[in-house]
């Protein structure tokens, strides 16, 4: 086991987050921040961030991102970032892995933090697809690990059980993996493993053979009774000449009531999501939409941010609801993310190219970060607001191959709700000629304050 020690990271300071004044009308979104992360040492591109907020302390933020050490993507590490003052100052930890990607963080019930990444395991084989788990018991100041959950993984994510169910406090790790079925053929499977001891160890994983199609799992969530919900999407079939893309990609939901040992049949959520990782969120509030599931994704050609919701634990889903109402006649949107705060307010953020000018090869355009919220359980959305104060353009010399690989800052970005109901955003932004992290905080005034 290795312990990683800190080097200081400071943000360019901005005025602290202010609450909405008493005369602000319901439905107003207040943006504070757009603060650039500034680090000592070599200036390297940082991309694909993920963010977690301590459910017991909104000033305690933990993030992770990919650090690109060579612009041709041949060398990449990951780093974690921790803040104890609401994101004004941060401390950075470099994992110092020989190869790293897909970072994801989660804070447990007792404050234990888990970080998962894909990478090469130190002292083991040279495979770059180990699912590696790091653990911090001191709020993110130091890290122990990694332990490997095996090879052949992609897009691993974490969920924490904060329910009143029998598995409260558990961490769930989900990923797409490969396994050999009884016929001897290797299939794409959904992989789920549970830890009941704060990430020190994991139960034998469940590997789900769902079809003969290529699939990717997405981020799981846990309902108020402890039911685990795992989304996945299938997108291609195997042929003698390689993978053949399906005409329509499909999004599915699986549920488990026994801690991830067994699962329901796949329940269809959408056939409208194309060319992106979807994101799942659940309403944790005690309000009228408690346990409502929200699925966010992009449509074909990156034209729309689409939201679907289910009020019956994933059995039935609404038709897609367009979120980006103000994107114009030639919309371009990417990397949407969704979360729900303590009051049941649904927050959605995405990269938007409405002001980006001419496109290069259809998919490469300058973008800005936009945010909106729903106060009625996803039926309607407030007018979206621009969060970033400048455009981010991916195709820049200092970004190198990174702009081609991640034209919108990564396959995902960080969006989380604080215990007092605000939303915190963390994204990769190349306004400074290469991808660097930026953060902002948003308050949605969901009711008139007295």
Residue ranges and their predicted role:
Residues 5-16:
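Bacterial N-terminal signal peptides
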Residues 19-450:
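Extracellular, repeat-based ectodomains that mediate carbohydrate processing or recognition
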